[in-house]
Amino acid sequence: MLDLSLPSGLRDLLPDHSAHLAELSSKLHDVFSRFGYRRVFLPTLERLDVVERGLSPAALADVMKFVEPGSGEVVAIRPDITPQIARLYAARPDALPSPARLCYDGPVLRAREARAGRPREVYQAGVELLGAGGASADAEALVLLARSLERVGLKAPRVEVGHARFAEAVMEAARLPERLRSAAWEALSRKDRAALAAAAAKGRGSAEAREAVPQLAGLFGDGALDRARAIARAVPEAAASLAETEAALRIARRRGVREVAVDLGEARGLGYYTGITFAGYAPGAGAAVARGGRYDGLLARFGRPGPAIGFAVDLEFATQALERVNGRGRGVRPRRASARGGRARARPR
């Protein structure tokens, strides 16, 4: 008998659900356009070396690759669209002068599920601001994210802001032994003060830096910026990243973004993001519907160095958030992977 089931982690989207995704994408592109972002369409397949050049080490396991029958070339199904944008920007300076504001939507496919029950194929819409650095560009991305979430119908969405270099600067100043660094970052991702303190006690840095390491787990919620300022006074290496964060927040707030939270102990995206990071949340939701940040190191990998910042909205997460808010239940669940499938760590967006 013919097996009509789909591979694990994939699913069909029926007409009603497809219409919701299309409507969300249309609303997002309306906002993107008003901010001056121009839409591009990109292929689903890329050469493997292009894809790998644009991913963090943790995301390489998410690449689905195969040998193209005709050419014998190794190609990959995109697990993320940002590297494609970087490749396009580097390849076409004639058509894309700096700064370039580009937007996109489309599916990405990852080799493994990010979490049990989550699909491997994710529909995204996003923006990239290429060739613009500084607080003004950071704030533009924050404001655009907030306006985008409002436009799709999420009332009082919350934007959470961090900085990739703040915790990293503190960890480096504490001079943790090489064998403990990975464990310390894992502890920070769990907000585990005790484990951070144990790792810091073995550090060879200043007493102030070692004392600051467990405090990273508390740099969220009310008073987070005050606590971060105290750390930056004790650990001057962290001061620049805090100043960048506060500058972007001041501009974003002047432009009307009010629901902003801070988490400067965020460990997501280590090795990929180089500056401010942010996530967008629906009211009452624990999972982010959008993620992004500054990734100034990426464009140089493709031969056109420069600053860059962007974010992507998970269209299905956004749809599900709207369904919760409106009391409807049209969510679509993917076919679950077997226990052998394990967990995936996708690129941090």
Swiss-Prot record:
Pathway per the UniProt entry: Amino-acid biosynthesis; L-histidine biosynthesis; L-histidine from 5-phospho-alpha-D-ribose 1-diphosphate: step 1/9
Keywords: Amino-acid biosynthesis, Cytoplasm, Histidine biosynthesis
Entries under SUPFAM superfamilies matching the protein: Class II aaRS and biotin synthetases
Gene Ontology CC terms, in alphabetical order: cytoplasm
Alphabetized CDD domains for the sequence: HisRS-like_core (cd00773)
Species classification: Bacteria, Pseudomonadati, Myxococcota, Myxococcia, Myxococcales
Single GO MF annotation: histidine-tRNA ligase activity
Broad class of the protein's primary localization: cytoplasm
UniProt keyword Cytoplasm present: yes
PANTHER family xrefs: HISTIDINE--TRNA LIGASE, MITOCHONDRIAL-RELATED, HISTIDYL-TRNA SYNTHETASE
Region feature (Disordered): 327-349
Keyword Chaperone: no
Domain of life, source organism: Bacteria
Protein name (Swiss-Prot/TrEMBL): ATP phosphoribosyltransferase regulatory subunit
Protein's GO biological process: histidyl-tRNA aminoacylation; L-histidine biosynthetic process
Purpose of the protein: Required for the first step of histidine biosynthesis. May allow the feedback regulation of ATP phosphoribosyltransferase activity by histidine.
Quaternary structure note: Heteromultimer composed of HisG and HisZ subunits.
Comp. bias regions, Basic residues: 330-349
Protein family membership: Belongs to the class-II aminoacyl-tRNA synthetase family. HisZ subfamily.
Compartments in which it is found: Cytoplasm
Miscellaneous comment: This function is generally fulfilled by the C-terminal part of HisG, which is missing in some bacteria such as this one.
Pfam families (UniProt xref): tRNA-synt_His
